[in-house]
Amino acid sequence: MSTLMVQGTTSDAGKSTLVTALCRWLWRQGVSVVPFKPQNMALNSAVTADGGEIGRAQAVQAQAANLAPHTDMNPVLLKPNSDTGSQVIIHGRAVTSMNAVAYHDYKAIAMQAVLASHERLKSAYQVVMVEGAGSPAEINLRAGDIANMGFAEAVDCPVLLIADINRGGVFAHLVGTLELLSPSEQARVKGFIINRFRGDLALLQPGLDWLEARTGKPVIGVLPYVLDLHLEAEDGIDQRQVGKVEQLLKVVVPVLPRISNHTDFDPLRLHPQVDLQFIGPGQAIPAADLIILPGSKSVRGDLAYLRSNGWDRAVARHLRYGGKVLGICGGLQMLGEQVHDPLGLEGAAGSSPGLGLLAFETVLEEEKQLRNVSGRLSLENAAVSGYEIHAGVTRGPALELAAVQLDDGRSDGACSADGQILGTYLHGLFETPAACSALLRWAGLEAVQEVDYHALRERDIERLADLVEHHLDTAALRRLCGL
C-alpha cells in the first residue's frame, strides 16, 4: 500500500486535473486507487455517500477511480464565509467557524483528522493519490502545514511537482519552489511535470535538460495544453463555452461575493443552445430569457450586494416583461420575504428582507442538511437528481406549490402561481438530462437538444488518462506508486 502526492508551484497549476488523470490511468490497469486531499479551501462541495461534504474536485477524482465520494477523501474542508474567516468542516461535518489566526492554532487538531483518514484509505486501497493545496513554498503558511509538505513528511510519501508553462516562468517556478523547501522536503520531490505546453517539444528540450542538470531530478513528462477539456472548476468560475447553434436561450447569473457551487452552471455552459453570461459588479443585467440566482455561503450579505448593484430592480423588471427566474439553494432563500440568522451563522445575527417574490421565510439553523436526492420536477414530471447542502429551514404557503417531489416523500422548493418563478434547494439539477431539458423548455427554448453532462465528464476523464499514457513516463509513475 503506497501514497503518492502531487504538489504544485502555484494555485491552478493543474494538481486537481493531474490527480484525476492518474486515478483513471491506474484504475484502467486494475489498480485500486483512491483520491485524497488533506485540506481543501473551496465553496464548491459535493455530498458524499456517508452523508458529509467534500470538495467537488475530490468527487470528480472519485469518479475517475470508479468510487463513490467519501468524507475520508477530503477530511478538512474550509468554506470561506468572510474575507478573513471560514466554516471548518472535519470529516464532512461543520464543526465551527473561525478566522485565519484561530485556524492556525487549530491545525494540530485538523492534522489528527487528516492522518486518521489517510490511514483508513491506505489500509483499503493499493494507492492513495494525494493532491496538495496551493504551493508548498508559501513561507507564511509553512509552520504547522497540513496540506503540502507537512503532510508528506508526516506520512513519508514521495512528491511530484507540477507547474503551468502557459503562464510563463516555469523554470523559475520549479527551481524557486524547490529552493524554498527544506533539505528533507527537497529530497522528497521525485520529479517534475510541466503542464499546458503548446508548441514543438524539441524547442523546450534544452530547458528540460538544464532543469534536470540543475536540480538532479527528472522531468516525468510534459502535458499538452488541451483547449476543450471541461472538468468542473474548483475555485474560479469557468466561463468558457462550447460552439453554439443559432437558436440560443439567454441565461444570466449574477456573480455574488460568496457564490457557492457555481459548478451548477457547467451543464449550461456546455449546452450548445444556451448563451450563459455571468454578470459582475457594476454591470447591468442584460435582456435574458432566464435569470438564475445562485447558491451563497452568506445569503444576507449577498442579498445586500445584489441590491447595491441594482440587480433586485433588474429581476423585477425582467419578470414584468415575462422572463423566468430560478433560485438555487441560497438563491431560493433570496426569493422569499425574509431571511433570519438568529445565531449569526453567516455573519452578524439578524434578519434581512428577501426579494418578496415567493411567500415564505427562511431561518438559518446550525444543523446543515446534507443529502443526495432524486425525484421529479413539477415541470413535465421530469426525472431529476441532485444534492442538498444548506443550513436553512424554509416555511410558508408558497411551498404548497412545490418545485420538486422527492423520492423520499418530501417536497422541495416552490413555484409561483403564474409559472414565472421556480426555487429549489437542489444543486446539480441541470446534470440530469431530462430535468435540464424540461427547465430549458420552461425558460423558453423550443427544440431542446438533450445533453448528457455525466457522459461529457466521463469522456474528458478518459482523455486525461490517455494524456498520462502518451506524455508521461509511466514506468517511473508505477515505481513511485510502488507497483
Swiss-Prot record:
Q: In which pathway does it act?
A: Cofactor biosynthesis; adenosylcobalamin biosynthesis
The GATase cobBQ-type domain extends over: 248-435
| CDD domains named in the record | CobQ_N, GATase1_CobQ
Pfam families per UniProt: CbiA, GATase_3
Catalytic site positions: C329, H427
Say if the entry is tagged with keyword Nucleus: no
Annotated GO biological process: cobalamin biosynthetic process
InterPro entries reported for this sequence: Class_I_gatase-like (IPR029062), CobQ/CobB/MinD/ParA_Nub-bd_dom (IPR002586), CobQ_GATase1 (IPR033949), CobQ_N (IPR047045), CobQ_synth (IPR004459), GATase_3 (IPR011698), P-loop_NTPase (IPR027417)
The answer to keyword Chaperone applying to this record is: no
Q: Name one GO molecular function term.
A: ABC-type vitamin B12 transporter activity
The Swiss-Prot or TrEMBL record describes its family as follows:
Belongs to the CobB/CobQ family. CobQ subfamily.
Q: What does this protein do?
A: Catalyzes amidations at positions B, D, E, and G on adenosylcobyrinic A,C-diamide. NH(2) groups are provided by glutamine, and one molecule of ATP is hydrogenolyzed for each amidation.
The protein in question is named: Cobyric acid synthase
Organism of derivation? Pseudomonas fluorescens (strain ATCC BAA-477 / NRRL B-23932 / Pf-5)
